[in-house]
Amino acid sequence: EIASCLVGSEMCIRDRYCGKVLPEGGKLGLCGLTASCGLVRSLQKELDAKKGTIKLLNLEDELWTEGRPALPATPAWLLPKEYAGFSPAEKLGQLRAKLSELGCTAQLVGKLDNLAWLLNLRAMDIQCTPYAMAYCYVTPDKATLFIDTARVSAEAAAELKENGVELAEYGDVLTFLAAQAEEQTVLADPVSVNYAVYQTLQANPALTVKDEADPLLPMKGVKNEVELAHTREAHIRDGVAMVRFQIELENRLAAGEELTELTIDEILHKYRSAQDKFLTESFGTIAAYGPNAAMMHYHATEEDHAKLEKKGFLLVDSGATYMDGTTDITRTYPLGELTEDERLFYTWTLQCHIDIARAVWLDYCDGHMLDTIAREPLWRHLINYRCGTGHSVSHVGNVHEGPHALNGRNTTVFKPGMIVTDEPGVYEGGVVGIRIENELECYHKASNQYGEFLAFCPITFVPIATSPIVPGVLSRDELDWLNAYHREVFEKLAPRLTEDERDWLAKKCAAIGA
């Protein structure tokens, strides 16, 4: 008998559930192409208590024979070196050097964001994420890209060939791996390689499989100077779009127009898509009014959404991917009268945001250590947020990536060139949700007899609402940071705005006192 169960999003809950419902000596069926090796191992640990086993099967192919949509096959293209900083050949050289250090001669790259970075490969197979469904097998003298070759243009195929990359069909990857006759030590990351691929590698006697974390993750986590320069520029254009969005929002509300949470995404798309080099939203816009914002990843729908009123807060978390960078920004806008608690929550959230943004630390500090800096202003009031403070952002890719982050579990040491979001918040269920988010760039601040000091600088330039701030709460240093930030916002955005827009921005960026 094969016991089946729904796989939930929480790994530990899912694994315990499967272990609970499986009968003694039972079998759990799953598709090895859609389950990572790490997932299967985690499940097996829970099944061991009942002497249960896992059986790989693909019931979808057997049962869904009619009307099944094909896999996504959007046009695949290469991000130009002028945006990426390095060619695929140069990145392959970097990877091979790292593999040699790890005692490996080959790697199967199965994680789409790592593969995209390695080969500068982009497509639109995943909503809001410019990646192609593919695998890449890298050896000392060759790289083979498994992809639906029909969607790779002749120009892109020629460029890949020039960079030492051969094309093969996506569906041939398992056959290819099983047929490898040359002895290789293959790096396979259990977290990112699916179980069917991992088993195929293990079953080939010519291949020795070595479990290692994917070295591409830290390589792409530190942005090169070209990537940094372009993403800074992308954020300025994104800031222009955000300014125009807020102006329209304020004008339409002032005119008494009835707006809903759904209206927000429409306005944002209008202004972002008008910007040069726009590709797509980087994720589905979160526009949450009033109590809805207390649900951290709330999404309005046609069936369930709120109307905006002239009171309370509107939280807008949004972003875009351009040819030269990916953005992620949250602003919480006051729409009218606020309660004293709402104003205090907003001010304390802003303190958290500022304190991590202006932090200075020694170069051994990791995301876990820095996370406490952001939370301390809220902890003083016995408040906490049940999520991370920030996450890494890809360059022209997915809005969440690793290896670094600001949260209570991350142990990756921060390095110059890393980008991370700064997004503390207060979430009072059924009452209000507040979040303020910028992207920050880590840079080297100073060297002295005590060591190497690092710091952050913002790369998001959009005014932060100052009217909700409770007087006397922000310190002089925090006020100085906020005023300096707004001066920089105005300096960067004003030259790209109309005269009326500049006047509006000048008011939003006006210095405030204690």
Residue map of PLM features:
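Single conserved hydrophobic/aromatic residue that forms the stacking wall/gate
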Residues: 1-8, 12-13
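Extended boundary segments
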Residues: 247-279, 353-385
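Extended, domain-scale alpha-helical bundle/helix-rich regions
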Residues: 14-127, 131-135, 142-144, 167, ...
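Beta-rich nucleic-acid/ligand-interaction surfaces
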Residues: 115-119, 394-399
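Charged, cofactor-coupling segments
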Residues: 4, 22, 122-124, 128-165, ...
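Conserved AWS/pre-SET-to-SET junction and N-terminal core of the SET lysine methyltransferase domain
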Residues: 78, 286-298
